Amino acid sequence: PHDDVWTDVARMRTLNGEQQAGGREMHLCPLQFDIVDRAITQFTMPGETVLDPFAGIGTVPLRAVALGRRGVGFELSPRYWRDAVAYLRAEEDRAATPTLFGLLDATMPAAAAE
């Protein structure tokens, strides 16, 4: 295999599983999370904005938010757009929910952490 060909992509890691589980229309060409994650981390820095002009069910904006970026997407299909908004809201809620270890880190004095 060529060094520039990504052969370690998990083809099943897409939003179509969520679509099917929710009884919603599956996307014809789902993007794999591994491909999107790699592109986002290679070409953007945390806090930057990632734009997807053909967002579909929102994989790129969703993964951008999950990776600490801002995600923006445009979509013509109202059904896909509604699904994408739901995924993004859920991811924002997940990211805003504190974890036990995060709370401990926030409350522990710096000297005690050493």
Residue ranges and their predicted role:
Residues 1-114:
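S-adenosyl-L-methionine-dependent nucleic acid methyltransferase catalytic domains
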